């Protein structure tokens, strides 16, 4: 997401008091940025090699507020909920209720919604108690959010 020109979204939506759930650690670049802008970052990666690679970088950089998990991102991290922010770096055909249920009462989720190999909408979902406020931010193209985890 940083490469998508969302610097202003980060600045307005993150602060040192919040807990972030990131779905899709990848190289850990975005995670490292999030760690400097929030209190805790819980990040899930479905590929074991990527999780181990990025986790070693976090240790080297002494990012002690980052916690990594090798798992199915669509399941979230229920043991650590609720999250003030959830950032999903893979597209889903619709908003995953499992993740939405892990969002705090005033939380915000950023997620690309749409079909694989097509334009998708990056959606900002703000939870106000039991009410959801959805806003399209921009058109994007992300890899799909896949079920399960890979041991490679």
Tell where the protein language model's regions lie, with residue ranges.
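Substrate-binding/catalytic lobe of Class I Rossmann-like enzymes that use SAM or dcSAM, i.e.
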Residues: 122-152
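Conserved nucleotide-cofactor-binding alpha/beta core module
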Residues: 13-132
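Single conserved hydrophobic/aromatic residue that forms the stacking wall/gate
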Residues: 1-10
């Amino acid at each position: 997401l940083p490469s998508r020109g969302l610097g202003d979204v980060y600045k307005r939506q993150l602060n040192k008091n919040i807990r972030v759930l990131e779905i899709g650690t990848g190289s850990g670049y975005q995670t490292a940025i999030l760690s400097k802008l929030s209190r805790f970052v819980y990040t899930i990666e479905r590929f074991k090699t990527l999780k181990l690679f990025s986790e070693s970088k976090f240790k080297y950089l002494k990012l002690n507020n980052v916690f990594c998990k090798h798992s199915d991102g669509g399941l979230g991290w229920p043991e650590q909920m609720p999250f003030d922010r959830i950032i999903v770096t893979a597209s889903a055909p619709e908003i995953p209720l499992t993740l939405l249920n892990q969002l705090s009462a005033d939380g915000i989720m950023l997620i690309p919604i749409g079909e694989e190999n097509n334009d998708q909408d990056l959606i900002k979902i703000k939870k106000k108690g039991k009410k959801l406020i959805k806003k399209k931010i921009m058109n994007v193209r992300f890899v799909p959010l896949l079920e399960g985890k890979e041991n490679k």
